[in-house]
Amino acid sequence: MWRKLEAHLGPEVSPHLLLESHFDELRACGLSRQKQGYARSLCEMVISGELTFDALPEDDEEAIALLTRIKGIGRWSAEIYLLFAEGRPDIWPAGDLAVQAGLHKLLDLEERPSEKLTRQLAESWSPHRGAAAIFTWHCYNNAAL
């Protein structure tokens, strides 16, 4: 999808260019009507200055709160963005089913933990919960070490 957007809009995909694109053009790039709505909402927030990715709050919970104000972005999406795009070391996506399943396997729990229990189990791993998340994903896809 991203390659198709770059082919249509050029290598510097900008909010302005995306907003100027017609529905059918974006549909041909793989964006459904719903995804286009989310993308347009995001572009409008960036253009208006309501959202500046270079100036997200340093506090992880504040950054998550700001990102989840974007239509179509939930807590999981915000956490994944902060972990991988921003490299924030203490992000723990406790609602991620693979994190829960990996933790279940890693800690030899009787059942997959709930989101609440997943958060509680990782409290002592702060400020390195991002690394723990990556490790639990590994354990989900592979044998535990």
Predicted segments, located by residue:
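Alpha-helical ds-nucleic-acid-binding substructure associated with the helix-hairpin-helix region
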Residues: M1-R69
